[in-house]
Amino acid sequence: MLYSELQCSEAIRKAVEAVKDEVLTYNGSVIDAVWSASAGYNTQTGVYGTCSSRDAWGTEVPYLQSVESPYEEQYHNLLRRVIGKDYTYIEYNDSRTGEPYQSADTTHKDLGGFVQYNTLVSNGRSYRYINQFVSSRYCFDFGTDAGGTPCMTYYGFGHGVGMSQCGAVGYAAEKGMNYKQILQHYYTGAQIRTRTTRSLSLIHI
């Protein structure tokens, strides 16, 4: 298989060149630095094992703990879904009647505040749905748009484990944190080390 050189901007090239010999480690081993677009307000506790979009991925990983990410509100992906009678997506309508959902219960959360499952109510009947949204961290806000059409909004994008891209942007822009401070915030107990000829041990997943 042949690979061609990736085309990128000079700014990106300089950024990569500046840190090319640095690695993020935990107890001497290179970490699996997972990340997602937006974590809502807290990242999830990361655990490995059976692949799941919920909080539990298997056994606990010490450097993937729930941490604060307070700048998400300004930078997160804000999504709105119309749930009026003309909305046809089955995940927001009762598949039996076609009627829009009337309410949602998202109180079933883990310690990081992430919804484990949600219960939607339509015509007095309750249905439990798991992992039917783009994010495992979301908050429902029922209301109407400018035209009076019922809408539901939620925030967060991705699995929410490890570094949040939106949160990292917020920490840099609002608090002046550098990349080392941001990485050490999101990866609990991790250290940035310089790569040497004595290679660091790699993690095994």
Each model region followed by its residue ranges:
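Conserved, single-site charged/polar hotspot
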Residues: 1-202
